Regions:
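Membrane-interface extramembranous regions at the lipid-water interface
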Residues: 2-51, 84-100, 117-137
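Selective recognition of hydrophobic, aromatic-rich stretches within alpha-helical transmembrane segments
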Residues: 23-24, 66-86, 99-121
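Hydrophobic alpha-helical transmembrane segments in multi-pass membrane proteins
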Residues: 48, 52-56, 60
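Juxtamembrane "helix-exit" motif on the non-cytosolic side of transmembrane helices
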Residues: 61-65
């Protein structure tokens, strides 16, 4: 029984460390809110998108409890606008594309699907015109 408790405790510590690491990537993107240079790995981009969705759901719940119509969700998305654009531009740089590719999302349906396809691509190996490969750092 003692051994099971020790293993369980170590497993919980490992899970906590992994959660903190994922949250750290979200915070790192917020710190780089005005950095449109360089590259962003898939993990950095998608962890930011994941936590952004989680916090938007929480903001929506708060809106529902208070009876407001999208006030907190709207404020949250407004606050996340520049960090989201910055990490998206860096994500495009990682696959060797210009940040201007973000405008493809303005093409209904097909543009958003193409952008999704681009964001799930692995970054270019080695250096490219936008900087060093963040995977190697």
């Amino acid at each position: 029984m003692q051994q099971f408790i020790e293993i369980n405790t170590k497993y919980q510590q490992l899970l906590t460390i992994k959660r903190i690491r994922k949250m750290k990537e979200y915070i790192d993107v917020l710190k780089k809110w005005k950095d449109f240079d360089g590259r962003a790995r898939r993990r950095e981009y998608w962890m930011f998108v994941l936590f952004m969705a989680i916090f938007a759901i929480v903001a929506g719940i708060i809106d529902g409890i208070l009876g407001t119509v999208c006030v907190f969700v709207g404020l949250y998305y407004l606050a996340m606008l520049l960090p989201m654009i910055a990490v998206s531009v860096r994500r495009m740089h990682d696959i060797g594309k210009s940040g201007w590719w973000l405008f493809i999302t303005f093409v209904p349906v097909i543009g958003s699907l193409w952008y999704l396809f681009l964001t799930i691509q692995d970054g270019q190996p080695g250096s490219n015109q936008y900087g060093e490969n963040p995977k190697g750092v």
